[in-house]
């Protein structure tokens, strides 16, 4: 019998599941997660490195709250840390070297032709379409703009 080693995938075959409740109440875009709108929306599990379990647990806690209504998807993130660093102020600039928050939206679940939105502490946005993951030879379409996106950022502390 022929046996070949099968490497363990770098990412868990089944990502964590988050129940995304329907929004209740009136939403105000101001970056403040401590408002009644968010009170009944549960936090996600703490975020981990996208590269998988072989990587260390992040030094600082990051988690999010997500809900929806007939018109919008609402995402609030709480990023903890004692240093808030941002340099990028021009839209659609590579910003993952800053402290940033990234959202990946893959409606088909195929990891192909998915949307990415990043924002930093200055509320600078980088939205792009990815043909497939970079590790699989994917290319980003930075000229693409995510329709209807609005963001806000609230900082507790000083930037830089």
Sequence positions of predicted segments:
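Structural preference for beta-rich elements and adjacent junctions enriched in aromatics
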Residues: 1-160
């Amino acid at each position: 019998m022929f046996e070949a080693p099968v490497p363990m995938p770098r990412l868990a075959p089944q990502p964590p599941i988050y129940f995304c409740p329907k929004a209740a109440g009136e939403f105000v875009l101001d970056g403040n997660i401590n408002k009644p709108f968010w009170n009944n929306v549960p936090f996600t599990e703490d975020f981990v490195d996208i590269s998988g379990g072989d990587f260390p647990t992040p030094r600082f806690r990051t988690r999010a709250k997500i809900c929806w209504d007939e018109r919008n998807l609402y995402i609030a993130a709480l990023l903890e840390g004692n240093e808030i660093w941002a340099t990028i102020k021009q839209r659609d600039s590579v910003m993952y070297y800053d402290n940033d928050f990234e959202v990946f939206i893959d409606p088909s679940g195929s990891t192909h032709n998915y949307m990415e939105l990043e924002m930093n502490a200055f509320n600078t946005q980088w939205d792009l379409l990815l043909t497939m993951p970079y590790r699989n030879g994917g290319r980003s379409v930075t000229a693409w703009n995510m329709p209807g996106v609005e963001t806000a950022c609230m900082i507790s502390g000083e930037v830089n």
